[in-house]
Regions:
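C-terminal segment of classical bacterial N-terminal signal peptides
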Residues: 17-29
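Short N-terminal segments immediately surrounding and downstream of signal-peptide cleavage
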Residues: 26-50
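Glycine-aliphatic tripeptides that mark coil-to-beta-strand junctions in extracellular
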Residues: 45-49, 69-73, 94-98, 118-122
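Amphipathic regulatory helices of Ca2+-sensor modules
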Residues: 51-58, 73-83, 99-107, 122-132
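Short, exposed beta-strand-loop hairpins at the edges of beta-sheets
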Residues: 112, 117, 121-126
Length: 138
């Protein structure tokens, strides 16, 4: 019984330490740089709105399994938070059309581009806004 308790406590301790580290890793500059490489077809080291929308459109098509032209919460797999759902779904029909999805990508692109140069680099992708954008692109 003591061994089982010790194993449980050890596992809980490992999870307590590793889960926050994993969330930091996903937003780290190296993760963002890796993601950027797959989203940057012209290899200029940045993602512009056209590239972001192309990636988002491809992901939308991949996620849209029931062919009704929209994504619901289930199909989005948590890519849009409950807090942000109203922004992504302005007609409040509980689904996001491709046009709404791409409009939301544009909103997040602007948030992820604090210097307003029209492009998003790896550092900007590693920000919270950049991370939210990545969830809609990959």
């Amino acid at each position: 019984m003591k061994l089982k308790t010790l194993k449980t406590l050890t596992l809980a301790s490992l999870l307590a330490v590793s889960l926050p580290a994993m969330s930091l890793m996903s937003a780290s500059p190296s993760f963002a740089a890796s993601a950027l490489a797959s989203l940057d077809p012209d290899h200029d080291g940045t993602v512009d709105l056209t590239e972001a929308k192309a990636a988002a459109s491809a992901l939308f098509d991949k996620l849209e399994k029931d062919h009704d032209g929209t994504l619901d919460h289930k199909e989005l797999h948590g890519r849009i938070s409950d807090k942000d759902w109203a922004v992504a779904d302005p007609d409040n029909d509980k689904t996001v059309s491709k046009d709404e999805y791409l409009a939301y990508v544009e909103v997040l692109s602007k948030k992820a581009d604090p210097d307003n140069d029209g492009t998003i680099d790896a550092k900007e992708l590693s920000s919270p806004a950049g991370h939210a954008l990545l969830r809609l692109l990959k």
